[in-house]
């Protein structure tokens, strides 16, 4: 009965192909799964929004350098600064009277597990440096930036929107 043998052989090959295909799908998903599940990082271009006025304040480019997130002002467009090239008049030390555009305002933030360590943020409007914490929200489309003195409870937050 060669036809029964042939049918059994074809069924075995067919089931082997299905099994092989299942194994390949599982392997691909296992390999790609971590990439799909990775959270966004704070690196990117962010539009700041004033926590006092609710108006857009400018753009900050956040980059990762040796595990540290650093934020640099790339544009200022909020109304209390009619000057398109405002200076940090209230800053102290080397930053006194320097252009706000190009100024590093965020530094020292590092990834720590699923969150980010405390860093420092400069408020160029006040010339003050605060401790800060950041948190990604809305699947990485928003960044909560909390500046504080002492403990996070004694501070204020801004929510920045990702531009790229």
Q: Which residues fall in each region the model found?
A:
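N-terminal signal peptide c-region/cleavage motif recognized by signal peptidases
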Residues: 32-34
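N-terminal helix-cap/turn-to-beta initiation motif at the start of protein domains
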Residues: 36-45
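Edge beta-strand at a domain terminus
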Residues: 140-142, 148-164
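Bacterial N-terminal signal peptides that target proteins for export
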Residues: 3-25
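Central antiparallel beta-sheet cores of small beta-barrel/beta-sandwich binding domains
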Residues: 48-132
């Amino acid at each position: 009965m060669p036809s029964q043998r042939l049918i059994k052989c074809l069924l075995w090959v067919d089931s082997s192909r299905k099994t092989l295909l299942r194994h390949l799908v599982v392997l691909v998903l296992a390999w790609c799964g971590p990439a799909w599940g990775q959270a966004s990082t704070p690196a990117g271009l962010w539009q700041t929004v004033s926590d006092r006025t609710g108006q857009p304040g400018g753009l900050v480019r956040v980059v990762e350098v040796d595990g540290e997130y650093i934020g640099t002002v790339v544009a200022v467009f909020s109304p209390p600064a009619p000057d398109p090239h405002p200076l940090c008049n209230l800053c102290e030390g080397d930053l006194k009277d320097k252009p706000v555009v190009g100024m590093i305002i965020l530094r020292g933030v590092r990834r720590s597990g699923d969150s980010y360590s405390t860093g420092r943020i400069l408020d160029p409007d006040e010339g003050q440096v605060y401790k800060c914490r950041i948190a990604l929200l809305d699947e990485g489309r928003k960044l909560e930036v909390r500046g504080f003195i002492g403990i996070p409870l004694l501070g204020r937050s801004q929510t920045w929107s990702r531009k790229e």
